[in-house]
Amino acid sequence: GVPRDRMEGVVRRKGHPDFGIVDTGGITLDAHAMVTEGPEGIRGFESDILRQAEAAMKDACAVAFVVDGRDGLLPLDEYLAAHIRRMGLPTLCVVNKVDGLEKEDELLAEFHSLGFPLLPVSAEHGHNIRALTEELADLLPDDYEAEHEPPALRLAMLGRPNAGKSSMINA
């Protein structure tokens, strides 16, 4: 099934502070309905996922916004990006599933319109995963030192279902 709860883990890098990461359920909401009705118009399963994503962002110090490169930029991506910007958190737009795509530069230009730094990756093939951990660590505050177990600072991963959030965590 589709997870509606947050899944939490720890990113450990030799010689660097550990940091927590929160994988949220995939957000499937109709962007038009969200714009016209707002989150209070959403009910049931989708409401649970949205609440968990909101809670993850409130607890986080940064966001990895995961999008599916094969699908291109969708209205829901634009809605979520606007919402993330309102939260004011440092954000990296992770464009997953770019392996084998032609015109990658054009695709990245499309996502560049969201206004976040971009990193193309392929969680399935391990492309740019090491760079991803470095970029995510760079989003943490400069004075961050992991002295707590689990780490006090967390990064939230948001995006649509099947964008590859969990695959990146597991890579």
Spell out what each predicted region is.
Residues 1-59, 67, 110-113, 135-171:
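Conserved G1/Walker A P-loop phosphate-binding module
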Residues 80, 128-129, 163:
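Proteins enriched for Cys/Gly/acidic motifs involved in redox and nucleic-acid/cofactor modification
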Residues 12, 30, 75, 103, ...:
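Active-site-proximal flexible loops/turns
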Residues 89-92, 97-154:
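Canonical P-loop GTPase G-domain recognition
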Residues 42-47, 57-79, 88-105, 120, ...:
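Conserved Switch II/interswitch segment of TRAFAC-class P-loop GTPases
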